[in-house]
Amino acid sequence: GGLISGIACAAKQINPSVKIVGVEPEGAASALAAVEDDQLVKLSEVSTIADGTAVKQIGETPFEYIKKYVDEIVTVSDYELMEAFLLLVEKHKLIAEGSGILSLAALKKLHCKRKKVVSLISGGNMDVMTISSMINKGLISRGRILTFSVQLPDIPGQLEVVSHLLNECNANVIGVE
């Protein structure tokens, strides 16, 4: 809540008519819950790949700033975050953590065509295993990678049969375990 609080306060001081939209992960929407109830709310659990925003309760000071300066809060799913991550990596050759791409993931929901929009992308606090996992999950969700298991009889040539079937489907084998 601290990042949007500061940005919203500064932006509204410069231009009071600017629209400020906050974005939270669906699995950790503590600010949205607080705004809807007009009081701090402690979520029973949080579950999101955006670990930097995975808080059960927003802080009191950010909550006050959000009530005063933020016009709307939307949520995005972990799937939408993975899609945004993959877009950022493939099209722009950039890496940002899940919490840092919430605004990018929300752009499709906000109907921003032909509008001046600032989407803040921040934070590169990710280890290589998380990066690899996010890329693989994104490719799987887009149908670009398929993972499957098959039990083959212990007869010579069976792997060749599977390889031939994959070739007929114009598929590529990335790895065999």
Residue ranges of predicted features:
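Glycine-rich phosphate/pyrophosphate-binding loop at beta-loop-alpha junctions
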Residues: 2-68, 108-114, 118-153, 163
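Short secondary-structure transition/capping segments
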Residues: 18, 71-72, 166-171
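Active-site-adjacent helical/loop segments in soluble small-molecule enzymes
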Residues: 59-115, 174
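Short amphipathic alpha-helix segments
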Residues: 155-176
